[in-house]
Amino acid sequence: MKPCMTALRQVIQPLSLNFQGNMVDVPFFRRKDKVVFVMGATGTGKSRLAIDLATRFPAEIVNSDKIQVYKGLDIVTNKVTPEESLGVPHHLLGTVHDTYEDFTAEDFQREAIRAVESIVQRDRVPIIAGGSNSYIEALVNDCVDFRLRYNCCFLWVDVSRPVLHSFVSERVDKMVDMGLVDEVRRIFDPSSSDYSAGIRRAIGVPELDEFLRSEMRNYPAETTERLLETAIEKIKENTCLLACRQLQKIQRLYKQWKWNMHRVDATEVFLRRGEEADEAWDNSVAHPSALAVEKFLSYSDDHHLEGANILLPEISAVPPLPAAVAAISR
């Protein structure tokens, strides 16, 4: 039975609080509204899980990926397609048209709060999903109004690092087959080699710079082919490094939010193919996540849902990331 969201909240008079030296008027909730977060490193299946949950509960999705907020480069940024979204409304996905300016954590905080409020007003559950942990931290840790108004449940989709790296490599090859290079070629600006801001930071854009310049300069075919192969390998390498950094950040956040973070291990899904993979997904990821969300939505505010005891995997030191990639991982 789907929980009735109207019954989950009761608003009474605003409350004035002193927050960092300033008096802030905030709504006081006897029962807070509830927000679900789906976290995980790149490639682990966050979008799939968010959509699965949104088809089981009355929910809408708010994107928290700092590159997917921009319009364009749908292959490079691996946005969900209309077919994959299964009709579930998505917010902050491809909505920023100024692709040369950074969409900061403060920008996300402001727009995400608006999206969450609009979703809650329609008696639906906001599911915030994406890999930009600085966005989530800005919303949960740095915004007093958000903390006072909402209870949060965090789902962490995890995959064994060697298995994830193998999958990421395969995914990059598929993205190339789908037209990644042509997509980057269309936005390539030979007058600029600055990839420090906006959508140009996306992994897959700076790595192709040298190859695209070689095309324009009519280098020999064998040279351009070699540069393309090098660029693709660099895309794979940087994506794996990004995944490691994201995992490190999630482990740090887990220590802060341990009481209501639920880790689901999707490794088995990536070791299987076809129907077996779908079955493993349902059993290992979708079903336990749905149970956690159902309990979270059903319990009153004074019940703390304990996340499962998590034995955190050891993460070895990660080599320094290129500046643009490091910016994405924050």
UniProtKB/Swiss-Prot annotation:
Tissue specificity of this protein: Expressed in root primordia, columella root caps, upper part of young inflorescences, and fruit abscission zones.
Transit peptide: 1-39
Conditions for induction: Down-regulated by cytokinins and up-regulated by auxin. Not induced by nitrate.
Residues at which ATP binds: G40, A41, T42, G43, T44, G45, K46, S47
Keyword GTP-binding applies: no
Keyword Nucleotide-binding tagged: yes
InterPro entries membership: Dimethylallyltransferase, IPT, P-loop_NTPase
Top-level lineage group: Eukaryota
Primary enzyme class: transferase
Effect of deleting the gene: No visible phenotype, due the redundancy with other IPTs.
Catalyzed chemical reaction(s): dimethylallyl diphosphate + ADP = N(6)-(dimethylallyl)adenosine 5'-diphosphate + diphosphate; dimethylallyl diphosphate + ATP = N(6)-(dimethylallyl)adenosine 5'-triphosphate + diphosphate
Chief location: plastid
EC number, as in UniProt: 2.5.1.112
Record's subcellular location: Plastid, Chloroplast
One Pfam assignment: IPPT
Function as written in the Swiss-Prot or TrEMBL entry: Involved in cytokinin biosynthesis. Catalyzes the transfer of an isopentenyl group from dimethylallyl diphosphate (DMAPP) to ATP and ADP.
Family: Belongs to the IPP transferase family.
Name under which the protein is recorded: Adenylate isopentenyltransferase 5, chloroplastic
Gene expressing this chain: IPT5
